[in-house]
């Protein structure tokens, strides 16, 4: 009850104050307050997923309307090719998928999880459809074309999100894309990270050859 009546709305208010929800419009420009951060999309997605979990337990028209408003913002500002990232679209559009350390795939994964949870809780599939378009774009850029500047995420998350997307939709290629991301780890050159060694992101060896826990533990989990 505390989560439903207090926590979810306190976080909502804080995200409004800090500009996280406004950032979904992808219209920030230099000189404006509340410059988006590279992982803000994941913050918003986690809130949306939490709201979905609450809605699954008990309907709440006010909470559902708040999520729907955010979904509409995403729909209005998603790129035609399916890409959606508030930081890169507004701040560095030319740098899309060029820096492994900047959490694009991590943010995408949290958005996928939120979309699955919301569809499961409410039966509404608009958000899910938007994120399936994004997943399809990621599959094309990373697996089919291999045109991104990196091939595996700097921060794991999208792998488990793609499994959830597969379980909900039955679309096996999402499972195969998850497998592809996992099995590509440790198979590419050192020095692809600007700030961290490959061990930091569990990319120093193929997954099945790793015998010790290394790097940033949240990524490893």
Predicted stretch roles:
Residues 1-221:
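Glycan-recognition and catalytic cores of secretory/periplasmic carbohydrate-active enzymes
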């Amino acid at each position: 009850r505390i989560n439903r009546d207090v926590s979810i709305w306190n976080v909502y208010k804080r995200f409004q104050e800090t500009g996280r929800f406004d950032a979904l419009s992808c219209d920030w420009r230099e000189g404006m307050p509340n410059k988006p951060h590279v992982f803000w999309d994941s913050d918003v997605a986690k809130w949306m997923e939490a709201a979905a979990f609450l809605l699954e337990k008990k309907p709440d028209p006010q909470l559902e309307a708040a999520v729907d408003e955010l979904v509409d913002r995403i729909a209005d500002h998603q790129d035609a090719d399916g890409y959606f990232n508030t930081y890169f679209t507004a701040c560095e559009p030319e740098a899309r998928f060029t820096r492994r350390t900047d959490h694009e795939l991590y943010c995408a994964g949290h958005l996928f999880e939120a979309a699955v949870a919301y569809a499961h809780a409410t039966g509404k599939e608009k958000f899910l459809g938007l994120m399936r378009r994004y997943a399809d774009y990621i599959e094309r850029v990373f697996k089919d074309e291999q045109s991104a500047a990196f091939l595996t995420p700097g921060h794991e998350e999208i792998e488990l999100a793609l499994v959830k997307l597969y379980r909900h939709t039955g679309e096996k290629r999402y499972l195969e894309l998850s497998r592809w991301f996992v099995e590509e780890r440790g198979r590419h050159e050192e020095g692809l990270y600007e700030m961290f060694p490959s061990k930091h992101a569990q990319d120093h060896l193929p997954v099945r050859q790793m015998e010790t826990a290394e790097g940033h533990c949240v990524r490893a989990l």
